[in-house]
Amino acid sequence: LHVLVGGLGLGYTAREALRSERVARVDVVEFLPPVIDWLARGLVPLAAELQADARFAVTEGDVYQRLASPPAQRYDVILIDVDNSPDEQLGDANASFYTETGLTLAKQHLAENGVLAVWSYADSATFERALRRVFREVRVEPVHFENGVVGEAETNWLFFARG
């Protein structure tokens, strides 16, 4: 499987993808050069583990611009972990990804039966409707967990789409 990850962060999403023996390659697109520098200098907690895996690659760029452009290759899985939620983006330019048009462009980057997964801290009926207009199969999963930092239960959301 070939996996595209939007956003490096602390590297946990990439590491989880690399745990599968079925994964041949994980390409991470990170917008912020300092985050890539932290990885190179070993300041990201998973830096050594990620950099030791020959299947891992990180490039600087805007994953949303990449997904809006004609595909250079197709991915079996696209994991987006960039914005706070479809309704609360980190930058105004990101908003177009969450629309029917943006999702149609992103879908072109998926291999046949490929899966798009988007993390969010909040549910979004508007985004779910856009996904359902573009993809054959859509599933929205709440993820309940105890946030040890703030000492309370939280719910995040995963949006899955295929076909």
Predicted features, each with a name:
Residues L1-E112, V118-W119, R129, R139, ...:
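The AdoMet/dcAdoMet-binding core of the Class I SAM-like
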Residues Y121-D123:
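Active-site beta-loop-alpha junctions enriched in small/polar residues
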Residues T126, N147-G148:
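Generic structural signal for helix capping and beta-alpha/helix-loop junctions
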Residues A161-G163:
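Active-site beta-strand termini and strand-to-loop segments that position acidic
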